[in-house]
Amino acid sequence: MTSSGKVRIYELSKDLGLENKDVLDAAEKLSIAAKSHSSSISDAEAGKIRSLLGKGGNGAKPAAAAPAKPAPGKAILSVKKAAPATPSKPTPAVSKPVAKPVAAKPVVTKPAAAVKPQAAPKPPAAATPKPVISKPAPALVKAAAAPARPTAAKPVPRPAAAKPQVVSKPAAGKPKLVSKPKATAKPTAPTPRPTPARPTPRPAGAGSPARPTPGQGQPKPQIIRSGAPSRPGAPTRAGAPAKPGAPSRPTPRPELVGKPVPRRPAGTGVPQRQGGPSRPGAPTRQGRPGMPPRSGNTLELVGKPIRRDGSTTGSGRPGAPTRPGAPGRPGMPAGMRKPVAPGELMQLQKPVGRPAAPAPRRPDAPTKAGAGAGTATPPVARPNSPSAPRRPSFRPGGPGGQRRPGRPDWDDSARLDALRSRSPQKQRQKVHIIGENDDSLAAQTGGFAGEQENMVLSASLARPAKPKSQQRTAPKPVAAMRKRKKETARQRQRRRAMELRAAREAKQVRPEMIVVPEDNLTVQELADMLSVESSEIIKSLFFKGIIATVTQTLDMPTIEAVADEFGVPVLQDDVEEAAKKTVEMIEEADKAHLIRRPPVVTVMGHVDHGKTSLLDAIRQARVAAGEAGGITQHIGAYQVEIEHNNEQRKLTFLDTPGHEAFTAMRARGTKVTDVAVLVVAADDGVRPQTLEAISHARAAEVPIVVAINKIDKEGSSPERVKQELSEQNLLAEDWGGDVVMVPVSAIKGENIDKLLEMLLLVTEVEDLQANPDRLARGTVIEAHLDKAKGPVATLLVQNGTLKTGDVLAAGPVLGKVRAMVDDNRQRLKQAGPSFAVEALGFSEVPTAGDEFEVYPDEKSARAVVGDRASDARATRLAQQMASRRVSLTAMSGQANDGELKELNLILKADVQGSVEAILGSLEQLPKDEVQVRVLLSAPGEITETDVDLAAASGAVIVGFNTSMASGAKKAADATGVDVRDYDVIYKLLEDIQMAMEGLLEPELVEEALGEAEVRAVFTIGKSAVAGCYVTTGKLHRNCRVRVHRGKQVVYEGDLDSLRRNKDDVKEVATGFECGVGTDRFANWEEGDRIEAFKMVTQRRKLTT
């Protein structure tokens, strides 16, 4: 039945036990609209069809007034229980409900008689009934509706069992069913088990064993003819939801006379479990041979049952033969049938029109209500499909599991019904737990029914054989796989070759830096240094317009360009030469007066790796905080006194810049040092300036102590730094090498004492000595022009003692020491070996890196200075001419063409080292289109003379960490001279490069506007107009257009006319049509593509 109170044709046919065709014919006679077996009809129409088919016959149902009398030997007897009649909406019934009902035994009622409640009789100790068949009366009795399933909340009270009333009507040759109550059991009705899938409530008696209460009699069983089953208002099954509101259908029932005679031996039943929980829809466990007797009434069949041909069998189908082994005997387990003769079959039914197959239950579950102790299991017929989803009751293969026994084994419709009844979500087979009483099941499955069921189960589980076509084509995928395997073999060879090539490239790690000796290399030598193939170098040169072979020599600019393309910086050999110690400070006469001197330690490393912060931690000062941009841009000299082996020892530290522009400074620092401290950040590793510092230290042949800084920072990895340094042949002591590596933290001050101790140990091995009793010799570390003090130089005394008033010569500069101060700004009278001081009294700013020497008198000093000044002047002129890199012919040609651009600069810086660093960086800027002319470069402040020179030559004054003298700013404002001051070298170089680019003429570039497609051509007089559709962008009037026809450009010029709907417009956007016309082109064709663009100016960039 559908959820809206309607019945489908196929459900009605199953209820009536007829074919769908018979029901459709009956509906057609009654003018009821029903097209097919799945059509739905109302309950009233279903009642009309039932009445017609009941009167008409077909052997389905006897008429209500005159029931058909079956022929002798043709009737099938069935013991039927009285169903508890409390659905969710109970239908009117004859019986009176009781507040707490018990499960009723089937009673034999006279159709016209009313059913009265009666106490349940005591169940007998053990018996199998012998039924006595009585002829049914023509009167009708209304059957109660099938009970509904319980909800999870509370059970619904059920009616009391009906009082049996036996009416005898003798019939010759028919057996009698004799029943005698024996004992009364006292089980407690269990709590109904909720079922989530079925919300409709079911009385507690449904699915529960018959447990009569004391003081109540047990009803007697009744015999109902299978040909006339009782029909409730709505066809329901045991455990299915009740359909409220459906009218009940009266059904004539035969009566029982007498009491049942015990036939089976005692001990064949299974004792009823008391209080066990029942599962709704679980089958009743029947008695088994060899088991203790089951309490309750038993029935005994006396005489031969009567069969009638064409009558409705237990399955509800007319004419269907009775299935052998159907569960019709008490004591037989559900699903296990004893093979008997076909004529001796007896079907036990419930008093419902559509009996349903109960689902299998657990072995320990009690019997269902209405199937009292010792009563026969009702026949299992195929239920109609309910509207709500239900639990499938078909359990193949499980012990005690029931097949759908309403149809014979050879009927395939039984399997089809089983498949249809399963919903896709519930097709998983549920495991049935075998209890202790199921041991005898195996012995009962060997009969005809067991063999038939096993055969059906095996057939249902068997895998179908593969078609011959699939078996024939099975080898084809193997062949295809073999074919693909051959193809992948060639691909594997190519992949292996690529992997080998990649492995070779991985092994040939490109260096971080290369050093070029003598300013030239051959192509093969450059390829070996860069760890690339020589063909890659030749290809790179070819793209630069240079045809070269592997033996061709390349000059320095070409080498730098190629190396820069591969990402490797180039270090010239002369820079490394600057780090070599060329002058021996200790002479032969000093060896008799040598004493130990403090070591000079130079701190080197990459920019921002913490060199100055490490020195601050050693000196307990904050020099790094005062550095512009946080980076060191000049050399600082400091002296630290520490305690070692219970004596005070001194260390002189030189702090060098880490920026790439200060290569010469690092070389000078390395030249005068005794030990190089290489600072490497633990979170950054080895960087280009780190490698450069390593090369400087090796060129100066000084030992290296590695300080792995920033170990407190997240992501630091000292082991990774050691690994990278090992690739540069710096192997740590704990790795089996000879290089001291100390992890430190400059911020937190970790391991600073250990680093100092290691420095002293290394310098003790070097045995550093000097003669303090001679005239001083040393090196100019740094020099600058102080506006108050004049030229100031930082001097490192390497041998002898420098005193106030000494006359010295520093390169071409003559000086007389007027005063000396140390790093703490304390004035000194003298400075011994390895002492760094700032000295005043030079005639001009000396050049950083020059050696100084003290002479006994001023005359000898001036003679030496004069010779050096002449040499320095010649060298300076040569450098200025070389910086031009432009011949007179080239200059005149560029001037005539208007391509010669010059940028004049006047450079003033704080110290000499900064001047040479800036000049070195300017040399590396591209000079093909703009020349940089440095008219003046010197340390010191910007003076009024500098402003006058800049005004006369049109130069820009660039100051670096310096200030302006009095009157210079006023003069600059009056003459309009641009004065720039910087404190970070990055910003200075960027601004100079942008100024050079500003001198270049801007270039014109195309800017795309849109495209249009010519869809029509209109001739207007002698000219033609193209009807276009704008596909992308916009078309602007007076813009440039390019007409494409296929792959050729047929016209390029201005767009003179642009119209839309005969109106002149300035622009047409995407998706609109327009007319395009040009004065110089009229040869338009359909399909032409118009490209619109405009010319815009763009700032040019410097190119190398």
Swiss-Prot record:
Region (G3): 655-658
Low complexity bias (residue ranges): 60-119, 127-164, 203-215, 227-246, 311-336, 366-396
Gene Ontology terms for molecular function: GTP binding; GTPase activity; translation initiation factor activity
Main location: cytoplasm
G2: annotated span: 630-634
Disulfide bonds: none
InterPro entries: EF-G-like_DII (IPR053905), IF2_II (IPR044145), IF2_N (IPR006847), P-loop_NTPase (IPR027417), Small_GTP-bd (IPR005225), T_Tr_GTP-bd_dom (IPR000795), TF_IF2_bacterial-like (IPR000178), TIF_IF2 (IPR015760)
Stretches for region Disordered: 51-444, 461-497
Region feature (G4): 709-712
GO cellular component labels: cytosol
Residue ranges with Basic residues bias: 481-495
Coiled coil stretches, renumbered: none
Domain annotation tr-type G: ranges: 596-768
UniProt-annotated location(s): Cytoplasm
Chain intervals with Pro residues compositional bias: 189-202
Keywords, in A-Z order: Cytoplasm, GTP-binding, Initiation factor, Nucleotide-binding, Protein biosynthesis
Segments of skewed composition (Basic and acidic residues): 406-420
Annotated residues for binding of GTP: 605-612, 655-659, 709-712
Domain of life, per lineage: Bacteria
G5: region residues: 745-747
Known function: One of the essential components for the initiation of protein synthesis. Protects formylmethionyl-tRNA from spontaneous hydrolysis and promotes its binding to the 30S ribosomal subunits. Also involved in the hydrolysis of GTP during the formation of the 70S ribosomal complex.
Family: Belongs to the TRAFAC class translation factor GTPase superfamily. Classic translation factor GTPase family. IF-2 subfamily.
Entry-linked HAMAP family: IF_2_B (MF_00100_B)
Protein's name in the database: Translation initiation factor IF-2
